[in-house]
Every structure is written in structure tokens, then in C-alpha cells.
Design a protein with these regions (language model features):
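A beta-strand edge to alpha-helix "cap/lid" segment located at domain peripheries
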Residues: 13-46, 53-149
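Bacterial N-terminal signal peptides
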Residues: 1-9
Length: 149
């Protein structure tokens, strides 16, 4: 009987833990977008694990936190990089040990040269739990989906 109770309770605890982790990484997304809109390359870089890999669209992978920091310093210094709004719609979220994996669709709007530009895409992100209990980006890959004309 005790074994049955244990087996019945463990999945519930795992779901609660997954929900708690989802809340934590959702807050990290919020911090990330805020840092990008402030053009704060250091704050963006701090959201990445030391051994992270960034896989930007149509570019070579950026490997390691130092290289990712340099990537973001160049990105936010570009005058074409402007503030944006972004809405993420998670379509899968799984936790395995100290890794949380999420796929999502995103929709956003930015204004450049007085023209409003809408964009849509998808991403795959793996978050890694740090020794201090926080979650940082371990792998990140995204792509925009061209609008249908």
C-alpha cells in the first residue's frame, strides 16, 4: 500500500516542480526582453550559462558565454537594433534533471524608420539549473517564419 501511495504522489510532485520551474524561466524571459530593450548586453549575457550555445538564424553557432557576450555587444550597438514587444506562446515544456526544455512560438512588433514591423517565429531553448538554484540559458535556437503574402 505504501508503495502505491508513493507512486501516486511522485508524479504530482514532479508536476508541481515543473510548474515552479516554468514560472522561474518565464521570469527569465521577461528579464531577457527587458535587457534587450535597454540594449544592456551585460544583463543579456548574464542570463546565459558559462557553457551556453546560441544558434542565431542564418549564422554560425556562438559557443560559450564570453563569445555570446561579444555577440550581444555587437547586436545592441547596431543602429538597426530597436526596441520591440514580444509575446511567447509555449507549446511544450519538459524538465529532465537540471535541464528544462521549451519550444515556443513568438510574435512581436518593432518600429523602424516610422514603420511598424510585425514578426513571427519559433524557438527552442534549454535552460540549465545553476548551483545557486537559478535557471540560465544553456542552448538557444530561433528562427523567424516569413509572413504569408
Amino acid at each position: 500500500m505504501l508503495t502505491f501511495l508513493f507512486l501516486a504522489v511522485v508524479p504530482v510532485l514532479a508536476k508541481d516542480n515543473e510548474a515552479t520551474i516554468k514560472v522561474a524561466v518565464t521570469e527569465r524571459y521577461r528579464q531577457w526582453i527587458a535587457a534587450e530593450n535597454k540594449k544592456d548586453a551585460e544583463a543579456i549575457t548574464d542570463l546565459y550559462d558559462e557553457n551556453a550555445v546560441l544558434m542565431p538564424k542564418q549564422e554560425e553557432p556562438v559557443i560559450g558565454k564570453a563569445a555570446i557576450g561579444e555577440y550581444y555587444r555587437k547586436l545592441v550597438a547596431d543602429p538597426h537594433f530597436v526596441r520591440f514587444t514580444l509575446t511567447l506562446q509555449s507549446n511544450s515544456f519538459h524538465v529532465v534533471g537540471d535541464i528544462a526544455i521549451e519550444t515556443a512560438d513568438f510574435d512581436g512588433v518593432l518600429t523602424r524608420n516610422d514603420k511598424q514591423i510585425h514578426f513571427h517565429g519559433k524557438n527552442l531553448i534549454a535552460w540549465k539549473k545553476q548551483k545557486d538554484g537559478s535557471w540560465k540559458i544553456f542552448r538557444y535556437m530561433f528562427d523567424e517564419i516569413p509572413s504569408k503574402k
